[in-house]
Amino acid sequence: MEEKIRLAVFGQKRLSREGGIEIVVKELCTRMAQNGCDITCYNRAGHHVSGAEYDKTIEYDGIRQKVVPTIEKKGLAAVSSSFFAALCSAFGRYDVVHIHAEGPAFFCWIPKLFGKRVISTIHGLDWAREKWKFGVGSKFIRQGEKNAVKYADEIIVLSKGVQKYFMETYGRETHFIPNGVNRPEVREAKLITDHFGLEKDSYILFLGRLV
């Protein structure tokens, strides 16, 4: 019988729909668990947006969840949780450690030091975002990017632009794997009609966010 691949995952807040990374991790890990992988997600401590009853969920769709110590202060939550997740994954019995985002990748050298195979998924050039553009946060995230280049066995990027950036900046080969989407279930917009009195084909609905 073939032995299961043991995989540790961190970088997400928790398995929820709080953000893009969380959705990617949830969808990816759920499918990998269905395909026979043994997966542990190291989640950040703190309140789950879906309600307090979800804060300490141990298992989700075949995925083992563990909460790591977290300093719940602005600017420290992601750093502290990523550090402890890196330690846990380094000392745990895992074949692969999959790290999501540039900031958490700062600590990718820790599991690598303990002989783990490390994969880093770069969801975007976070250091260039407006909220991180200046100061310590930007420098930390940028160093995380450099550590991924230096220590990760494989790097996954989600866009051709970021793939080109890594090649031109670091001469580093990456794997371009864009995010997939679930086929939508088409439903009648009855709630919109009931609430706003708008009929089908009489309006345009735009959903988006500012980053």
Enumerate the predicted regions with their spans:
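N-terminal subdomain of nucleotide-sugar transferases
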Residues: 1-48, 92
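Conserved donor-binding/catalytic core segment of Leloir-type glycosyltransferases
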Residues: 8, 197-211
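A short helix/loop element that forms part of the nucleotide-sugar donor recognition site in Leloir-type
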Residues: 53-55, 186-198
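A short, charged, and often flexible helix/loop element on the N-terminal side
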Residues: 60-87, 130-137
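An aromatic- and histidine-rich active-site surface loop
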Residues: 76-90, 94-127
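Membrane-proximal helix-turn-helix segments that form the acceptor-binding/catalytic region
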Residues: 87-90, 113, 137-155
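Nucleotide-sugar donor phosphate/pyrophosphate-binding loop at the beta->alpha transition
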Residues: 117, 127-147, 187-189
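Carbohydrate-associated surface elements
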Residues: 161, 180
